[in-house]
Amino acid sequence: MYFTSSISVRINVNMHSYLDNPACSIFAHRGGSIESYENTIESFNYAVDLGCEYIETDVQLSSDGVPYIFHDDDLHRFIGKKLRFNDLNSNELNEIKLFDRFSIPTLKECMETFPNTKFNIDLKTNEVMKPAMKYLHSINAHSRVCIASFSDQRLDFVKKNYPNFCRSMGPSEILSLKLHSLGLKKFLPEADCVQIPIYKYGIKLATKKLIETAHRLNLKVHVWTINDAATMDKLINLGVDGIITDKPNLLKERIATKK
């Protein structure tokens, strides 16, 4: 017996064009951060040259309001100093070299350099949410960008203000989908896809039952972040629609063995 919700929601009847890829797709995590230099133009070129269907990346905001491609809240991992990213202006950020070689790309530079590439973009902060979405909307990027976040608030903002953009599920929706797959809650999704780890808080999410449930709801399932061949093989056999990985070349090889 299902529990019911009083909230009226729509089922995802028509799949978003962003998701129009057959079989298991390769999401190069930060461009393939083990095989290349994460979140740089170099790593994105690497992923494109491999033929990856998608690039997963992140956006942070400079102190003067410019969206940049960057994951961490600070620069310690790259320059050994705990300078908060959003405390630095664009002039200061442009002087920094990642891996002693590469500039931190802006979102604009990324989208202009790779006009035919599909991106899965994680909005890292509330501050970057509005300027990033305003820019992506201004270049009509809804067919090649999916918005992701660990924040329900940010995803709700995208749903309300930019409904044409593909959106992955937030934490609350993922929990509802899991309960629905177990027959504990009725759930009709509003998002376009679900992107999950195998486990979260000790609960297994990437199960055959959840994947089948998502597919019945016309949702594609992407699993992160998978870097070993055995797990890739298991997920491909389970029927996931995409795998987010730091090793896109390895995943490409594993997918090839299934054809």
Task: List the model feature ranges, each with a label.
Residues 1-259:
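Phosphate-group recognition and catalysis centered on beta-loop-alpha active-site segments
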